[in-house]
Amino acid sequence: MNISTIDGRLIVEGAQILPGTFRNFSGAPDQFNPGGGKRYFHFVIDDPEVAQQMRNDGWNVKIKPAREEGDIPFCYLKVAVAFPNFQKNPKARPLDIAMFKSNGVNRLDETTVGLLDGAYITQANITIRPYCWDQADPSKKAAYVQELHAFVQESAHFASDYDEFEENPFND
């Protein structure tokens, strides 16, 4: 994984997006979001020095402690997925979210991004824009996705057998 900064944005290449309760692209109600509507995901920061530098820069990097002996603690960052309201702001920049599979690419929008909740994401490239949520302390940043290219491994063993069919149930 490689993390760099361009114009205040984080560029993350080869990220590991955490599965299960660490992602909620659909915005469904859950333990931490009982009313629903909040979309998010978390990715691992595999270099402790990079994680510390991000913390120093104001990013809200968390540490997941080891639960059992032999487990390794890891650092991660929560990233919000907020689609723009074009009625309120017609000049807003749309999000670029795409799911790359062996048979091509699917662009995802507000209605389809939930497909990533259950997908086996092997890696992702992410552009994250900061939002300074504390006006008194502009170093405190929340992370919002601007671009997400998720590389997905299909789970259906026979899916490639049906690529030639026009109405392929495995091609979204």
Q: Which role fits each region the language model picked out?
A:
Residues 1-10, 154-172:
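Acidic, gly/ser/pro-rich intrinsically disordered tails
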Residues 79-111:
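Beta-strand/loop nucleic-acid-binding surfaces
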Residues 80-86, 129-133, 151:
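Short glycine-rich beta-strand segments
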Residues 47-49, 134, 154:
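Residues that cap or initiate secondary-structure elements
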Residues 129, 136-156:
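OB-fold/S1-family single-stranded nucleic acid-binding modules
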Residues 98-124, 131-142:
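Exposed beta-sheet edge/beta-hairpin loop segments within beta-rich domains
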Residues 1-90:
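OB-fold ssDNA-binding interfaces and closely related basic DNA-contact patches used
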